[in-house]
Amino acid sequence: MPPNSKSKRRKNKSKQHNKKNGNSDPEQSINPTQLVPRMEPELYHTESDYPTSRVIKRAPNGDVIVEPINTDDDKKERTANLTHNKDSMDSASSLAFTLDSHWESLSPEEKKTILRIEKEEVFNVIRNYQDDHSCSCSVCGRRHLAMDQEMERIYNTLYAMDKDKDPETNPIKFHLGIIKELQISKNQQQNDLSSTKGEVVKNFLSSSTVGSLKEEVLHFKQKQLSKQEQAHNETADNTSLLEENLNNIHINKTSSEISANFNSVSDEELQQKYSNFTKTFISSHPKIAEEYVQKMMMYPNIRALTDDLMNSNGQGFLNAIEDFVRDGQIQASKKDDSITEDEASSTDLTDPKEFTTMLHSGKPLTEDEYADLQRNIAERMTNAYDTASKKFKDVSQLEKELFTRFMSGRDKKSFRELIIQSFKNKFDGELGPSVLAATLSSCFSSQSKDTSLDTDSIYEDEDEEDYDDYSEYAEDSEEVSEYEGIEAVEKPEHDEKSNGIRETLHLSYDHDHKRQNHPHHHYHSTSTHSEDELSEEEYISDIELPHDPHKHFHRDDDILDGDEDEPEEEDENEGDDEEDTYDSGLDETDRLEEGRKLIQIAITKLLQSRIMASYHEKQADNNRLKLLQELEEEKRKKREKEEKKQKKREKEKEKKRLQQLAKEEEKRKREEEKERLKKELEEREMRRREAQRKKVEEAKRKKDEERKRRLEEQQRREEMQEKQRKQKEELKRKREEEKKRIREQKRLEQEKLQKEKEEEERQRLIAEDALRKQKLNEEQTSANILSAKPFTENGVGNPVSSQSHPNMTNYQEDNSCSINDEILKMVNSVAASKPVSPTGFNVHDLLLPSTNNQMPAMEQSHLPQPGNQNNHFGTTTIPNALDLATKSSLQTENNYLMNSQTLENTSLLMHNNSSPTKLLPNDFGLSSWGGLTNTMSINPTCKPPVIQTSEMESQAHKSSPQATMPSFGLPNGGTHRKSFTDELNTLTSMLSSSGFADTSLSSSGFPPSQRSVWNDQKSSFSGPSTAGNFNNSSIQSGMLLAPTLGSVESFPNRTSIWDSSTTPMMNKSELSGRNITSTAQDSPAFMASNIWSSNSQYNSPYLTSNVLQSPQISSGVDESHILDSIYNTYLAISPQDSLNPYIAIGTLFQNLVGLNLDYSTFINKLISMQGAYNCEFFTDNNGSITHVRFARQTPAGHSKGLLNQLFSGLNDPTATPFTSRPHTSTRASFPIASSTTQTS
C-alpha cells in the first residue's frame, strides 16, 4: 500500500539507513560507552515541594545533582512519544509471550502436527503470496509458468543435496533442517557477542594467566569429581560477570570510608580475610582464589564490591544488580532500532502484573494471590539455587521469567526482601552472614548474566525441547532421523542452548541478509500499520518472498516499527531497471541460496499461520468454556436465589407452625386443668363408694364363711362313704380276678391237651399221605418211562410226547375220586375237631407232613433227578430259620396234588419248545387266592416226599427258566376246559402251599403285589366258627418276595375260603383275552423266613412306611369290624357341611369306643385303610401323621374266595361234599372268616 504521508516516508527512510549502518558490522555495534549506564536523574522525594527553578536529584551512583526543571512543550511531546512507543512495544511483547505460552501449552501430538510440513503446502504458500503481492514487471505481471517450474527445480536440487548427505532425509526433515539454519545463524551472532565480551575479560586477566588458569582448572576438575564439576565450568563465566559488573556499577561508598576500613585492619589480615572469602565465594581452587585477591587489591572497584558483600550483607550489591538489569535493558534497546522478539521479551520485564494477568486468562490477580505468587517464586528460586555450582537447577522457564520480572518490576523492594528472607531461612544455619551475602550476590549475578547475554534465553530451553519433541515424533514414525550435520555447530562457551523452532515463528527477514547488488529491485510492502494500535495481524504479517528467477526481493519491514514503506527513490527507479535485472544472471549457487531463503520464509509463514490458527482455536474454546462457566454461574445464582426463597418460605411456615403449636399447647393445658378437677371429684366419689362397698362385703364375707363351714362338713361325710364303697369294690375285683385266673389256667391246660391230640392226628395223616404219594410217584415214574420209550427209539429228543396226553388224562380221572375223598376228609376233620376247645390250631399244620418222616435211602437212590429245578420263590432268599424239612414236605405235597394237571401242561409246553412266558401275579412266590394260579414250576416227575436240608439249601439258590403254567380254570391252548375235579386239585395244592386266606387291600396297608397269603402278617383274628386263635405271624426281614408287574391285571380277592361273595369264575372267553403274566425274577421282595413268627417288620421296597404292625387284637373283634368302626367314627365326628374334611388324628382316636386299641395299632389300621377306604393323611415336618380324611363312599367289599362256594353247602342235604359249607357254633381263630356257624 502507498505511504500515508511524505513525512512518514522520510522517517522510514532514516530508520532504514540507521539499520543498514548499525547492522553492517556487528562488532562495531558494541559501543564501549554503552557499557556504562546512562545517568537519568530522578526526584528523590516526589511528594515534596521544590523550587520551580531547580530540583535536587540523586544519580544511580549515589551522587547528588541539581538540575532545572524542564517545562517546555518539546519535552512533553518527547515524553508522550516515548510513552506511546513503550506501549506499542509492550503490546507486541505481550502478544509474543502469549504465543509462546500457547506453544508451551500444546501437547506433543499437536506440536508434531504443526511442525509436519509437506512440499505442496510450501509451494501453495509461495503461489498464494505471488497472487496477493504481484509486481508490475513484465515477468511477474504475466505470471509465467517458468517461475513455478524454477522454484520446483531449486527445491528438488536442495532436497537431493540433503539426501546425499543423509540418506534418511524426507520432506519433513528437509523443511526442519532449513529452519534450523536460522537458529544456527542466531547462535553465531551470540558467539560474536560472547567473543566481544571476552575482550573485557582479557583486559582484566593476562593471556598467560588465563591459559594457566585453564590448565589448572582442567587438572583440578579431575580431582574434584562431580561436586566441583559444575562450579569449575562456571568459573570463567563468574569472573567475566564480576568484571562486567565492575565496569557498570558505581559503588555507593566513598573513598574515605574505604580508606578507613583499610586503616582499621592490617593489610596481611585483610588479605587473609579476602582469601577466605574468595575461596568460599569465587572458587575453592587455591590459584584462582590467589589470582582474584591480587587483582582485587589492584582494582579499588573490585575491592569495594568485596567489602560490601562481606560487611553489609550485599545490600549495595543488590542495588547494583537492579541497576545492571535496568542498564542491560536500555543497552538492548539501543543496539538496533528494529525491535525483534528478543527486545520485545526484554522490554516486557517491567510488567509483572500484566504478565501474571495474561497467564491468568486475562483476569487480574488479587493482592493476596499476587503476594503468594511472589513468595512461592522466591522460595522456589531459593531451593533451586546450588551453592556448589553457583547456579539455579531444575528451574522452569516460567519461574525464571517470573523471577526476572519481579526483580525489575515496580514492587522490586518487597520481592528483594522476600528473596533475602528466604535465603536466610535456608542458609543461615549452614553459612555465616558473609557467606550468605556472597551466595545472594552469586545467585543474582548468575540470573542477570543469563538475561544480559541472551535476551531470548527465556525461550531457549523450550525451543530445544520443541525440536526434541519433533525428533521423537520423527523417530516414532521412522521418517526422520537425527540431524547430525545440522547439530554439529559449535555451541558457545557458556553452553547456551539454541533458540529452536520458536525463533522461526518471530522471524521477519534476517537483517544480516545482504541484498544482491543488481540494478533491479522490487520492494513490496506487505502491511500498513496503524499508529494507534498493533494487532495480531501486524505481528504475524506477510513475509516478503523474493522472486528468485527475477531477483525480486520482497521484504517485509520490521513488524514492530509501525507503518514503514520503501524509499521513494527506489520506487521511481523500478521501471528503468527491469530488463537489466533479468540480464544480470547469477550463478547456480546463488540461485540455490536465494531459493533456500525463499523456502525458509515460506515455511516460517506457514508455521506462523498454523500457530495463529491454533491460538485462535484455543481462544475460541476458552471463550466457549468461559461462556459455559458464566451460564453455569448464572444458573447457580438463580438456583441459590430460589433456594433462598424456599428457605424463607420454609422459615415462615416453621414460624406459623410454632405459633400453632403454642396455641395447641395452651389449649391442652386448659383441658388438662379441667380434667384434673374432674378427676378429683371422681376420686372423692370413689372413696365414698369404696367405704360403702367394704361394709357390704364384710357382711357378705361372714355369711360365706358360715356357708363354707357347712359345705366342708358335708364333704367330709361323703368322702368317708366313698372310701368305704371303694374298699368293697376292691375286694370284689380281687375275688373276680382270682376266679378268672383259675379259669384261664384251666383253659390253657385244655388247649395244651388239644394241641397234643391234634399233633398226633396230623402226624398220622402226614404218614398216610406220604405213603400214598410215594405209591403215586412210583406209578407215575413208570408211566413216564413207558411213554418215553417210543420217542427214544425213534430218535425224538422230547421225553414227553403229546401221545401220552390220553394216558395222563386217564390217570387223572382214576385218581380223582381218591384225592377228593382225602381232601374232604381233611377239611371235615379240621371243622369237626373240638369246636368248643379254647386251644387254637392251624389248618396248615394238617397239610404238612411230619418232619421225622424221611424217605428211605433206597427210594431216594431210585428217584430220577429233575433236569430243571425251579426255585419256588423265584429269586427269593430263604433264610436258614425256615424249617427245610417242613418245606420239603410242602413241596412234595404240592407236586402230588398238582400232578394230574401239571403233567399234561408241561408235556404240551415242552413239546412246543416254549420259553418262560408271562405268568399270573404271585405276591410272594406262592399260590394265593388273589392270584388264582400257581406259578411254581413242576417237573414231569414227582419229587421225593422228603428232601435233605442241605440239598434244599443248595437248590434254593439256583434259578432256571420256568415252564409256563396255565391259569387256574383255563384250558391249555384255549380248546379244553378242565373238569371240576381238576380245579379242586389245583385249589387244594394252592391251599396246602400258601394257606387258607389272602388279604385284600381293604384289610392291609400294602399294595396288591405285596399282600401276604396269611392276610395281615402281624394280626391275629378270631371268628365264630373257629375253635381257637392263630398265633401272630409276621414276615421277617431278609426274606425276598416275588414282585408283581405293574401291568398285571388284578383279580378279585378273597378274605375266606368259606366266603360266598366272590364273583363267579371267569369263563373261557373272558380269560382267553387277558394277558396275565408274572415273572419271578423281575424285582426283589421280602418274605419272612418263618410265617408263624411274631413282632417283626416288613422290609419290602414297596412299603410306604416302616410302621410296626399292630400287636395282638383282643379276641371277639375281627379286622373288618375294626376298620368299619374307624370309618363310622370318622363320619360321626366330621362336619356334614364339608365334603371330605381333615380330622385330627388324636380326636379320631379318642372317639373310638369299645375297640381297646393302643395308638400304634390304631395308626397301623389307618395305614391299611388307604386303599379300600380312600384314606388320606396330612403329616408335619417330621413325617408324623397329624390329620386324616376319608372319602364319603361305601368301602370296597371284600372278595370271597372260591372255596367259600365249594364249602358253602357242606351241611346241605342236596349239596355235594364239595359244595357244602361247614358250620360251627363256637368262635374260631381263622383269619379268613368273619362269622360262620358249624353243625356237628
Curated annotation (Swiss-Prot):
Stretches with biased composition (Polar residues): 25-34, 951-965
Disulfide bond positions: none
Basic residues bias locations: 1-20, 514-524
Effect ascribed to mutating S208G: In strain: SK1
Locations listed in the record: Cytoplasm
One GO CC term on file: cytoplasm
Chain intervals with Basic and acidic residues compositional bias: 39-48, 488-513
Pfam families on file: NST1
Coiled coil: 616-777
Superkingdom field: Eukaryota
Keywords: Coiled coil, Cytoplasm, Phosphoprotein, Stress response
Renumbered residue ranges of the record's region Disordered: 1-76, 446-593, 634-744, 951-980, 998-1029, 1214-1240
InterPro entries membership: Fungal_stress_NST1, NST1
Phenotype when changing D162A: In strain: SK1
Record GO biological process: negative regulation of translation; response to salt stress
Claim: Heme is one of the keywords in the record: no
Residues annotated with Phosphoserine modification: S266
Composition-biased stretches (Acidic residues): 457-487, 558-587
Homology family: Belongs to the NST1 family.
Subunit structure: Interacts with MSL1.
Function: With MSL1, acts as a negative regulator of salt tolerance.
Extra information: Present with 217 molecules/cell in log phase SD medium.
The protein's name in its UniProt record: Stress response protein NST1
Organism annotation: Saccharomyces cerevisiae (strain ATCC 204508 / S288c) (Baker's yeast)
Source lineage: Eukaryota, Fungi, Dikarya, Ascomycota, Saccharomycotina
